[in-house]
Amino acid sequence: MYRYISVSEELSSPYLGRYRSFGFAAQREAAGHWQVVCKVSDVSTDPVFVENLAARCTAGQLEPVHLMDIIEDALI
């Protein structure tokens, strides 16, 4: 079983300065514990967008190998 969670990050860019962004962590349940199997950083500055997409990925039990494609499609 997989679950996807939003991850808040404080980042810095030479063009933007400091900013808060949100990424994803894919976790797999193993022996009663959740282990991170994949992380994608700096997806969006909109926390609701990332949380909603994470919930859809969890509900659909998305394989982490497809996460980048799903994120790209959602951003277009």
Predicted regions and their residues:
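Short N-terminal "domain-start" leader segments
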Residues: M1-G23
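Residue-level marker of intrinsically disordered, low-complexity segments enriched
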Residues: R3-I5, W34-C38, M68-D69
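Exposed acidic/polar residues on beta-strands and adjacent loops within beta-sheet cores, strongest
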Residues: S8, R20, A25, S41, ...
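Generic structural motif
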Residues: E9-L11, E29, V43
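Surface-exposed loop/turn and secondary-structure junction residues enriched for glycine/proline
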Residues: P14, V43-D46, V65
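Short aromatic-glycine-(Arg/Gly/Cys) micro-motifs in beta-strand/loop hairpins
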Residues: L16-V36
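A short, exposed loop/beta-hairpin motif centered on an aromatic-Gly-Thr core
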Residues: W34-V48, C57
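Compositionally biased, intrinsically disordered linkers/stalks adjacent to structured regions
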Residues: E51-I76
